[in-house]
Amino acid sequence: MSEFRTEKDSLGEVNVPADALWGAQTQRAIDNFPVSGQPMPSAFIAAVARIKQAAAEANASLGYLDNEKRDAIVEACEQLVNGEYADQFPVDRYQTGSGTSTNMNVNEVIAAVAARAGVEVNANDHVNMSQSSNDVIPTAIHVSAVTTVQTRLLPALSHLCGMIYEREALFSEQVKTGRTHLMDAMPVTLGQELRTWREQLLATEKRVEAAVDDLMSLPQGGTAVGTGVNAPDEFAGQFVKFLATDTGYHFRSLEHKFVGQSAIDSPVALSAQLRGVAIVLTKIANDLRWMNSGPIHGLAEISLPALQPGSSIMPGKVNPVIPESVAMASAQVMGLDTTVALAGQSGNFQLNVMLPLVGANLLDMVDLLSNASSILANKAIKGFSVNEDNLNAGVGRNPVLVTALNPEIGYALAADIAKEAYRTGRPVIDVAEERSGLDRPRLEALMDPLKLTRGGVS
């Protein structure tokens, strides 16, 4: 048996591996773009397959595609969505800017799968009916992003928030020294500190959800340039109806399809919100690293779970590996967002020509953030222990507590008391008792660290 077979397209003949399901156009792309060795993510291929399925159903409902071909295309698409033939989509993500190579890769594989089932289906005339790469690929960016954010990222963030809430409630009255500029400040509770992280995450969730809702509007039906040439007038409406049924998401048709093809503003907006998630995760990771620092000459407020030896030369050293991993993943997300922003500038006239890059980057961002959120919840937040002695020993001696005396004795005298406490190393309450004119019980009431975490004026 020959190692290759000959396929033909409008440019001529091409040798294709004999056992490959793809055809001539896919093979040309494989030959033309040996750039990264990274194909489009599987979630993107699944989204294109969903688009092909809904398009076949729409075309059949309008009388343009016979039921036998529709059923063969739909069955092939279901197989692709379920991960079958995953090795048949090798086209590099750094390819033609419209993503035509990936669109044709999917078209050709679907046609081949249908042929195996005994139905002759043409990749262009039937699988790609009423479509262009120029509306399929932007639509696939939307569909794949919506699907992965809803099924992966939002559940991961919700799990992280829930884990933080559990620890937050546990430490609601554990007082610690607050820090501004990394310097000692007024006391807070560990619960307040944890709640801050949770509130940040909840806010980013809402912003991501809003960006996802914007992505529900699809440019499918705009075909080549946004006008809808070669697509029936009713196609776009029928398409979103079937896609919503097939996926369970309430997709809608973009009124002015040009804006979803010549520009990618909605994907860029989602990317920015994903960057926002990365920024929050970085803040949490950095706080955890500082709180865990030491254990002898650092803050040593908490102890993160010991997950692996930290050094190949220093015995006994254990490092905060989960926060470090989360910080690196978050940095990568921020870099990917910058790339998406640059790609968003590449909308020349009627088509953006960095579509595969945007689609792949968004899915990489979702993967990184989902996984980072999960390990942060399960391997850091869940298992850290609190070093109560360290927290309690420092907070009561903190000269900054004299801030609570400002309303009673004025800023200037309070500053002098703080300076003397710093200079002598004596407890600030002892210095205040000598110099403030207030008795010990009053000072204890005013400078009670737990009371000070509740705000107000004593």
Where are the regions that the model predicts?
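Conserved, well-structured ligand/cofactor-binding cores
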Residues: 1-458
